[in-house]
């Protein structure tokens, strides 16, 4: 078996325009340009993830909330110091998505000070807060086996995936244990003994690849 680790789906970028004077304008604005850069992995299906914006004032109270997909190019602001949080809307629900397989979750925050009559400047990267596990099988696997599933256990979650699917987990749960179960065309079944992988990091996809011997060959990071 070969385990390959990829950097997962790149990093969202949150970029605001350079600060400059607006002598004839009252109030303040913060200009935002949200973009997503990603590297397709496991499947070529397009990835469409929007960021929401939550702005907190100096006392930690919510000053503004802008839902995902609704972030304008220019956000009117009052002068002061704020914490801008860029995140996906699934901070509390990502584990339940996709029938329990989970989904990617992104979050970052940055303090910004807005001066009266000026445009604010802010540049921040919004990384994934969780990690993913995927499965890769030999090209002719389906010709020899009628079914398969990879069982992944992490923390209190037990998730099953097939090739081409990803399951997402929390780094705080301390890694994962995985085991592949297969049934060949004659109806004979085999389940691999569970293997522990403990050194996990946020923002990565752990792609588990098998040969026909179901043995670990190498592992690249």
Label each PLM-derived region with a short phrase:
Residues 18-21, 32-60:
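N-terminal ordered "arm"
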Residues 20-41, 125-141:
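A short, Gly/Thr-enriched small/hydrophobic beta-strand-prone motif that recurs across taxa
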Residues 2-8:
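Sec-dependent signal peptide recognition
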Residues 47-93, 145-202:
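Tryptophan-paired
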Residues 19, 68-69, 90-127, 185-217:
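Structured interaction patches on ligand/partner-binding surfaces of diverse proteins
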Residues 29-33, 83-85, 121-123, 132-134, ...:
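Beta-strand secondary-structure signal
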Residues 123-129, 170-173:
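Extracellular and analogous surface-interaction loops
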Residues 13-16:
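C-terminal motif of bacterial Sec signal peptides marking the signal peptidase cleavage site
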């Amino acid at each position: 078996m070969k385990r390959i680790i990829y950097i997962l789906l790149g990093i969202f970028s949150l970029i605001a325009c350079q600060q400059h004077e607006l002598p004839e304008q009252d109030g303040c604005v913060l200009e935002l340009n949200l973009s997503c850069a990603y590297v397709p992995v496991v499947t070529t299906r397009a990835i469409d993830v929007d960021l929401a914006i939550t702005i907190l004032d100096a006392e930690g109270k919510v000053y503004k909330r802008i839902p995902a997909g609704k972030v304008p190019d220019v956000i009117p602001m009052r002068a002061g110091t704020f914490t801008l949080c860029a995140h996906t809307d699934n901070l509390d629900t990502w584990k339940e998505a996709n029938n329990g397989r989970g989904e990617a979750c992104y979050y970052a925050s940055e303090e910004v000070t807005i001066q009266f009559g000026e445009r604010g400047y802010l540049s921040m990267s919004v990384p994934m807060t969780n990690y993913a596990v995927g499965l890769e099988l030999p090209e002719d696997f389906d010709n020899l086996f009628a079914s398969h599933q990879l069982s992944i256990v992490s923390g209190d979650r037990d998730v099953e995936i097939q090739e081409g699917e990803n399951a997402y987990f929390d780094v705080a749960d301390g890694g994962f244990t995985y085991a592949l179960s297969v049934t060949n065309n004659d109806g004979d079944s085999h389940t691999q003994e569970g293997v522990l992988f403990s050194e996990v990091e946020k923002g990565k996809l752990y792609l588990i690849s098998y040969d026909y011997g179901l043995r670990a060959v190498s592992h690249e990071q």
